[in-house]
Amino acid sequence: MWRWPTVAGQKEASAKAKSKIYNIHSKLITLAAEKWSDPSINAALADAIHSAKRDGVTSDVIERAVKRWAGIDKDSSKVEEIFYEGYAPGGVAIIVRALTDNRNRTAPSMRHIFSAFGGNLGETGSVSNFAFDYGGEIHIKKPADMDMFEMIILDTNAENYIEEGEEIVITTARENYASVKSALEKSDYEIISSGLWYRAKNYTEVTEMEPALKIYKMLEEFAADEDVETVWNTADISDTLWKEVEQFVASKKFRT
């Protein structure tokens, strides 16, 4: 089954994508710093800084992000986390997490992207209340000793884990996320990324080229938007159809 990073990965090499990575990490750090600006006593801030450094964000950008929350940077506006929910073609449910310092810029952009590709922007809770679960997801480097890992993970409140290439993805209930992550850290497992995420309860199969193409373009536009941090969806598209979509996009300019 196709997964969202297929689209996001196409933009990694561009200068524009690098600028967005810096921008999003800066906002994540600013949000995390609201609780406390010292990463030694603010685990969320420490995680945000670690993630930013892993993606190549420079120290001066990180320092400015912390100063932004503290009010030292007087030219900066407050960063907000806003979720937008709706549907893509084919009845595919979509949740977009945006980090913005200007609602008047972000909201019209989200409405445009949904409508331009045959989707509909809904009200808060219109899909998150029934189409998704909300819980923890922790990615670690696949350990050499899987037997030991299984023994450790069974002693935690983790829900499940799956192998994805050289990574292990552990899922948890929202209330158990912190304790499971702490147990993995104490056991010296290398955490690649972690956070609270939406997970589809059921997937919506898309078998036709036209809706699959519009979903592709919609997600591509979300990826390009400077305020969009994460997109979750319920699309179930075969690898064969997804490859056909990618080939079509590569050969022709899509028009909405």
Region locations from a protein language model:
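N-terminal cationic and glycine-rich segments that engage phosphates or anionic surfaces
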Residues: M1-G122, V127-E137, R199, T230-N233, ...
